[in-house]
């Protein structure tokens, strides 16, 4: 007898609803650039799937926490630039610059 159980809960992501919600925000704030936050696996909704659904929808950036997440956005084929919200290690700075990504600065050294 197996001691594993199938998942009892899951999320089904409606990509049309994601795009609709983005457009609602855009209508409310027409003069602002929008960043779709996809850090932490798009808050459990699947980073790659959300990126693919929203890429091309005129988001200014995809907000990620780390360089590793920025790589996942790139590897998903996104044209939209990742914006790294978390602190970066010194060894990651060159990769950020080479890829043309944006990053928040958390210290003067960065």
Predicted feature residues:
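Active-site-proximal beta-alpha core segment in soluble small-molecule metabolic enzymes
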Residues: 2-5, 9-13, 17-20, 30-110
């Amino acid at each position: 007898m197996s001691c594993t159980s199938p998942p009892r809960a899951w999320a089904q992501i409606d990509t049309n609803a994601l795009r609709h919600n983005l457009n609602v925000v855009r209508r409310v704030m027409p003069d602002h650039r929008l960043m779709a936050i996809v850090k932490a696996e798009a808050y459990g909704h699947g980073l790659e799937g959300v990126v693919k659904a929203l890429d091309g929808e005129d988001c200014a950036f995809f907000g990620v926490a780390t360089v590793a997440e920025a790589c996942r956005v790139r590897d998903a084929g996104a044209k939209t630039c990742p914006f790294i919200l978390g602190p970066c290690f010194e060894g990651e700075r060159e990769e950020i610059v080479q890829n043309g990504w944006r990053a928040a600065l958390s210290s003067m050294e960065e």
